[in-house]
Design a protein with these regions (language model features):
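Active-site acidic-Proline motif in GNAT/NAT acetyltransferases
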Residues: 83-89, 120-121
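Acetyl-CoA-dependent GNAT
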Residues: 2-5, 10-78, 83-85, 102-109
Length: 121
C-alpha cells in the first residue's frame, strides 16, 4: 500500500522495535496510546486486528492499528499517530487514506462502518 513515499507495512517481529521509538509532541500523550500498549492489545485481539507501521521511504514515522468489532460490526482505527518530527507535513492524511483503503478490502469481515478513535481527556 503506497502513495507518494508513504506506505503502511504490517508490524512483524522484524520491525516492531521501530514502533517503540516513536514519540508524540508534548501534550499529545493524552489523545493516543503509545504503540507499546497498542501492540499488547494487538496480541490479545490478534484474530481481529492488524497493526501497521507508517513509513516514509524505509523509515517508520508513525503507527496505526485496524481492529474489527464483530459485535457491531465495524472497523475501528486505533492509536493512529505520527512521530513528532514528521508532523505537519500531511503524512497523517495520506496514512489515513491508506488505512481506509486497507479496510475497504474487508480483511476481517463485512461492514461499511469505520470509526476513528481517540482519548477524549
Amino acid at each position: 500500500m503506497e502513495k507518494y513515499n508513504i506506505s503502511l507495512r504490517q508490524i512483524t517481529e522484524d520491525n516492531f522495535m521501530e514502533a517503540f521509538h516513536l514519540k508524540l509532541a508534548n501534550g499529545q500523550e493524552h489523545f493516543v496510546s503509545h504503540p507499546i500498549r497498542s501492540l499488547a492489545q494487538a496480541y490479545v485481539y490478534r484474530n481481529q486486528c492488524q497493526p501497521f507501521g507508517i513509513y516514509k521511504d524505509d523509515t517508520m514515522i508513525g503507527y496505526v492499528m485496524v481492529i474489527y468489532d464483530y459485535d457491531i460490526p465495524e472497523y475501528d482505527i486505533w492509536h493512529m499517530m505520527i512521530d513528532e518530527s514528521n508532523q505537519g507535513q500531511g503524512y497523517g492524511g495520506i496514512a489515513l487514506d491508506l488505512t481506509i483503503a486497507y479496510i475497504k478490502t474487508k480483511p476481517f469481515g463485512t461492514s461499511d462502518k469505520v470509526t476513528l478513535t481517540c482519548h477524549t481527556d
